[in-house]
Structure formats: structure tokens, C-alpha cells
Amino acid sequence: MRLSRYYAPTLKETPAEAEVISHKLLLRAGMIRKLTAGIYTYLPLGLKALNNVAKIVREEMDRAGALEILMPAVQPADLWKESGRWDFYGRELLRFVDRHDRESCLGPTHEEVVTDLVRHEIRSYRQLPVNLYQIQTKFRDEIRPRFGLMRGREFVMKDAYSFDKDDSGADASYWGMYEAYARIFKRLGLKFRAVAADSGAIGGSFSHEFMVLADTGEDTIVACPACDYGANVEKAEAICPPAGDLAPCPAAEKIATPGQHTVEELAAFLKVPVASVIKTLLYVADGKTVAALVRGDRELNEVKFKNLLDAKEDLRLATPEEVTAATGAPVGFAGPVGLSLPVYADRELALANDWVVGANAADAHLLHVDLGRDANVVSYTDLREVAPGDPCPKCGALLDFTKGIEVGHVFKLGLKYSKALNATFLDEAGKEQFMIMGCYGIGVSRIVASAIEQNHDDGGIVFPPTIAPFEAALINLSPKDETACAKADEIYAALTAAGIETLLDDRDERPGVKFKDADLMGHPIQLTLGGKGLARGIVETKDRRTGEKGELPLEGFFEAFAAWRAGVREGWGLE
């Protein structure tokens, strides 16, 4: 492809709307343009990168035995009501009513649709297992779409769904997809980690997220340097030390604490450690107010708390008015003693007594509180977020914390949807059984953005060769010189014939403009041909990842180039 005939409108300045580096560079490199909030048009360069990702995803899905289909984007409400997710999914589900007053939604995911398909087609165990996938545009009505392709309302996703006759088969399907995902991200040239994760609104018995490692990632990954343990911070288990004998605790005592609203203020006022204070946090779940207790120096893990409550709607902090109605006190003075609502405590709190808690009265706290004696706690369970210094739940080594971007998620769904939608088959004994399901998602468009978040520099994008719209940029510095143009055309034809996607910059522009655009667009390989190089019989090279420059001879160019290119790809961990 010749850049003089290509639509690649690069920008010198970063649009004010762009916050994260991938959004900035995708706009500046002429890969996407915003239509409206969270919805983008893919320009030729962006679409080529998207298609390159989809190609590898499709190849590995096919290799794993999954079969490609294409399901409708519009889904009837009846299916979602049958599964129970119509009310549970929340406002991210874009709902509408057609001219016949039929309720529908734009699909953010397709568990209901694919289960409905299979339940009408599969009758016997002989038809199982089956694994169906699609690559399709999805829609989620994000409340605050931002970060370009990272968190848009419309996005391209690969979603696969497996159906098995028994648990062992479902496990085999799950781990088969897990391995396929690992191959995909390796082939894409990305640094990634698979971690245990919460199943969220999709549901299921267990799941893993595939995270692209990036300092700008929204997710925190907890990993053990000594074993294979890894988890999203939402899922990571917080380990308690062994319980010991507790000394007797004096009777609870109410004291005045005027103006001490936070645990830090209170601890300083009382001259006690923050860790001796209990935070009482009031939440509303499914219309009911509940309390969660964690140590003053800990943070509540809201995902763990929501899962404990099996909350159908989003968990939210109680408003100041709701706190006062439940406790009789303003925010900052709530406590578990005498509280007439369900109280749940982090299990760490059972290991000690003599706590400081709110007195459920303005400007007052209680000293010497023993939760077992003074409060009515429904249960003690793991409710806190893991923190630096916490041990690995598998081997006891101290955990490491890194940032990542979720680009893939695999779920073992079990019977969640097959039971709800009555997807059954007849087993070997002629007995009706529910199919056991798994689902597996990859954010195809998100991978493009994540690759940039992981791989960029001051000059622009640094794409891995398997994602880059063009693996090579051939820059002709002398577009008015017939000899230079003829040699550039010759090299371009040889590269193209060898299956190497190449962008020939034949524009009548200054060299500096061409070099800056090549860096900005992220071509992994840069080849430069100019009058001086022609005179010397060489082509200049640049490895975009390392910035290393070199030369290749025009005589026997392609053989020398093939060896050099292999080294560039090896640097990305590619064959």
C-alpha cells in the first residue's frame, strides 16, 4: 500500500478529550475517530490492527475445536427474563421497545441467545460436547465511557460458549480455552498473566482473567513470586494468622470524641494505633441496609461483600441520611453495638478484642469492645482487600502487586444458564440432564488499545509485529528520483510477495515528517531508502521496539532482510 493513496489522517496535537496514552495515540495516528461518547469509527489503519488481532483469535479458536457462528445483536427481553438477568444486569443493558411494544436489548453478551439456540437443537449426549464462538460488535451503556477503546460503549468482542455432558468434560473444555487464550496472547507479542477472578454478572463457579501487564492498567493483579498463585485483587484471598488465646476485655466504655470523624483522626485523638479501630461501613444491597466491619487500617473489598450477600443489584454506600436513619448518628460514628441491622465482619476481627468502635451517637465512641460479647455479628468471613505485606494463600511468600488491563475472561458457568433456560439432553441411560456450560470472552478492540498501553514511547505507538497494521514501513526519501522510486518499488514488491504487510511512504514530504509518522503509527520495522543509501548500495533499518538502527545491502537484500527480521520478531517473543 502506498501512503500517498492511503487514508491516514495523523494529528500533531493530542485532542483534549483523550486521557490515556492509547486513546491519544490512536487518535493522533489516524486509527480511530470519535462519533459520539464511547463510540468510534475505525479508520483503515485501526481496522487493519483490529483485523490482525481477530485473525489470530479466530485461528486459535478453530485450532481448539470451536465453531464460528454469528448471533443477532438485538435480543428479546423474554430470554433475559427467563434467565433472571433482565433485572440483575442493571442500566448497562441498553433496552428498547419496538413498534409492536416488544421489549428487547442490544446484546452486551450472548449466554441467553446461545443457550436458547442449543436447547432447541441438542437432544442427545452423542451431540456433545459443542463449542460455539463469534466475533461481533457488542454494546454496553457505560455510565461514563472513557479512555477510547479501553472503556467504550460499543466494542468488538470474541465470545465462545461450550456445552458438555458432565463435569469432567466441562473442565476439559475450560482448560482447553484457557490454553488457547495463552497461545493467542503469546502470538500477539504481549506480556500477560492469567489470574483467578470474580465471575461478576456472568456468574459461574470459577473463572480466570487474562491481563495485559501495563502500569496504566485499571486492575490490580496480586501474584506470588514463589509459586503460581495469581488473582485479581477483587478475588485475592486475605490470609489471617493463626488464632491465639484472647485476654479478658474490660467492659465497654462510652467516651466523647468531638469532631473525630475518620479512623485516622480518632486514632490520633485517642493515641491508639489505627489497627485497633473498627470501621463500620453501611451499605445498601437490594434495598436493605447492612453493615460491614473491617480493621481501621484495612479496605473493604466490595466484590467479596456483594458476593457474600448474593446481591442482585449493585452494592452502594449508604447516604448520610440513610446512615443517620439506621444508627441515629452522623457519618463517622456508626458502630456494631446495638445496631438493629445485619452486621458482617472480616474474619481478621475475630482474632482480637478490645476494639474502638463508633457509639451510634454524635461525637462518641466505645472503648474495650469485644465483638463476640457486645455485638451481634452474622458471620466472620474474608471481606478485606489484600495489601502489601500479606502472605500468599498457597505458599506463604509475600505477595507482589502489579497493574494490568483485562483483555480476556474464561468462566466455568456450570448449570447457571442451562437450568434457567432448561437446556437439557438425554444421557447414556436415557435420563434427562442439564448441559454444563462454559463461556469465554476476549476484547478484540480492547487488545489493540492494551497493546499500545504496554508498548509505546515518546515517538508514538510500538506495535508488536502481529498486531501492527503494517509490519514494515518503507520510507522513500527521494520520491522525485526515478532510480530511488524504481528500487523502492522493487523492494516493496518483494516484501509484499513474501506476505509481509508493507506501507510504502512515497509522499512528497520532508524526511522528518516521514520519520515522525512512521514512529507514530508504530510499524515494527522501518526501512529507509535515499539517494545517499543508493549510492552506497544500502538500505537503512530501524527496529521500532529497541530504536536500534542498521544497514542492509541492496545486493542480496531479501536474504539479509529475512535474517534481520527474524531477530526483530524474536525480540517480541515471536517465531
UniProtKB/Swiss-Prot annotation:
- The keyword RNA-binding belongs to this UniProt entry's keyword annotation: no
* Cellular compartment(s): Cytoplasm
- Per the UniProt record, which EC number(s) apply here? 6.1.1.15
- Keyword line: Aminoacyl-tRNA synthetase, ATP-binding, Cytoplasm, Ligase, Nucleotide-binding, Protein biosynthesis
Biological role: Catalyzes the attachment of proline to tRNA(Pro) in a two-step reaction: proline is first activated by ATP to form Pro-AMP and then transferred to the acceptor end of tRNA(Pro). As ProRS can inadvertently accommodate and process non-cognate amino acids such as alanine and cysteine, to avoid such errors it has two additional distinct editing activities against alanine. One activity is designated as 'pretransfer' editing and involves the tRNA(Pro)-independent hydrolysis of activated Ala-AMP.
Subunit annotation: Homodimer.
Q: What is this protein called?
A: Proline--tRNA ligase
